[in-house]
């Protein structure tokens, strides 16, 4: 029997359940260009409004995986472990985490993305290192992984091509927030990537795509279920993104902070989350006795970082770019900093040039925001709260508009408890 896209759209519009055949057909036809963008956006909106059950999401994910190639890491002598973050502000965790987990005995094939909107992209950050290359052939990627234990690079065009098309479409049709589509997008890529185990860092709060713990929990549970159904050992941590992670949001700024963490220093929240995710990855990969804190302290994680950067053409000793212009934002009053909004800081970093509005936009390596205080810290009137960095000073005005109203200072003595970094674990 022939399929037609109108009947598929109507099924979901009328709150029906899509059959496996309908799902397989529509994903394949859309990938081949037989189903038009406007028809797929109509179906995506119906899914956003009416949802999908677990069976539909599993079949949709399987169809996206089947649209392209699957990677194979069975030739490696080490177990593979991977991490995916749903994105946040100052989220540089992949940079110290991949070499740290590799230093403890797992192989970490980290296929990463670029930034879009207020959240930064791992590849943009690493490209601020002179000479470093994000684009590797499958052969080069396996070679780096085999020799250093970790690789961070761009996903090839062959992995889940259906997702690439649908991802770009969701971005411009107001359907980014559909939990079934977020879950299948992330998991189709990760399962096609061939990893044996996966740890999900699902961000919650103003700087995340999931604003509430309930939505984050639903997304995490859906993804853990999908991973398990496809034979990938999957665990999720729900983590706080009400305020930026660490003390920097940008590209070179975050690389510098990541290197500090690998050198045994760095902000406590970045260290805490890096270690929490490392322990989960190592346990999922069958290495529960490995001690990531020791690998940070003894320099072995830093050693893997240096070798990984060099293997991808980068110079680990090169000076990172610094911005031509800075603007300091000072505290207007003395007291306790009780709020510093992650979303607003992310928008400011983006407006300074650290991010892009369209996929083809360039980014400034040195642009971003540096924090001089975090919620819970005591501040004095006139002390620096934030430093804005850019190469184009006419951007300051737009960035300052985002920062305006982004923080609260309460009277000295106000009782304030910072949110924990890790909120929940879902397995």
What are these language model-derived features?
Residues 7, 12, 17-20, 30, ...:
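Well-ordered secondary-structure scaffolds
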Residues 94, 112, 119-124, 155-156, ...:
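Short acidic, glycine/serine/threonine-rich loops at helix termini
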Residues 125-151, 221-227, 231:
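A glycine-rich helix N-cap at a beta->alpha junction
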Residues 79-102, 106-119:
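Glycine/serine-rich anion-binding loops at beta->alpha junctions
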Residues 1-90, 307-311, 422, 426-427:
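Acidic, glycine/proline-rich low-complexity segments that act as flexible tails and inter-domain linkers
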Residues 111, 145, 153-156, 201-205, ...:
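Short beta-strand segments
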Residues 49-50, 96-109, 189-194, 229-230, ...:
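Alpha-helix C-terminal capping segments
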Residues 146-195:
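Phosphate/diphosphate-binding glycine-rich loops and adjacent basic-rich segments that engage nucleotide
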């Amino acid at each position: 029997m022939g399929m037609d896209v109108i009947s598929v759209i109507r099924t979901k519009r009328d709150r029906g359940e899509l059959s496996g055949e309908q799902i397989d057909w529509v994903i394949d036809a859309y990938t081949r260009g037989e189903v038009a963008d406007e028809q797929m956006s109509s179906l995506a909106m119906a899914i956003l409004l009416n949802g999908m059950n677990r069976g539909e999401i599993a079949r949709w994910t399987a169809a996206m995986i089947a649209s392209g190639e699957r990677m194979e890491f069975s030739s490696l002598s080490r177990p593979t472990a991977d991490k995916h973050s749903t994105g946040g502000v100052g989220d540089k965790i992949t940079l110290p985490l991949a070499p740290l987990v590799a230093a403890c005995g797992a192989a970490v094939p980290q296929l990463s993305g670029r930034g879009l909107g207020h959240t930064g992209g791992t590849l943009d950050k690493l490209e601020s290192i002179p000479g470093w290359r994000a684009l590797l052939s499958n052969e080069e990627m396996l070679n780096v992984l085999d020799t250093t234990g970790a690789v961070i690079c761009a996903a090839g065009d062959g992995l889940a091509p259906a997702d690439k098309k649908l991802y770009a479409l969701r971005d411009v049709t107001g359907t980014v927030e559909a939990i079934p589509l977020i879950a299948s997008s992330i998991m189709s890529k990760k399962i096609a990537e061939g990893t044996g185990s996966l740890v999900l860092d699902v961000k919650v709060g103003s700087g995340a795509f999931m604003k509430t713990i309930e939505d984050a929990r639903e997304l995490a549970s859906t993804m853990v279920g999908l991973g398990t159904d496809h034979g990938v050992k999957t665990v999720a941590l729900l983590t706080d993104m009400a305020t930026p992670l660490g003390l920097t949001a940008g590209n070179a700024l975050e690389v510098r902070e990541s290197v500090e963490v690998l050198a045994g220093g760095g902000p406590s929240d970045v260290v805490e989350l890096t270690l929490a995710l490392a322990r989960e990855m190592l346990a999922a990969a069958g290495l529960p006795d490995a001690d990531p804190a020791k690998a940070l302290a003894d320099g072995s994680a830093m050693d893997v970082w240096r070798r990984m950067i060099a293997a991808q053409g980068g110079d680990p000793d090169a000076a990172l770019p610094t911005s031509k212009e800075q603007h300091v934002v000072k505290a207007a009053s003395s007291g306790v900093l009780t709020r510093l909004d992650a979303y607003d800081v992310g928008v400011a970093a983006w407006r300074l040039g650290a991010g892009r509005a369209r996929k083809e936009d360039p980014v400034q390596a040195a642009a971003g925001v540096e924090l001089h205080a975090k919620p819970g810290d005591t501040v004095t009137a006139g002390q620096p709260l934030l430093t804005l960095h850019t190469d184009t000073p006419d951007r300051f005005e737009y960035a300052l508009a985002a920062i305006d109203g982004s923080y609260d200072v309460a009277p000295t003595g106000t009782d304030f408890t910072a949110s924990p970094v890790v909120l929940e674990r879902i397995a």
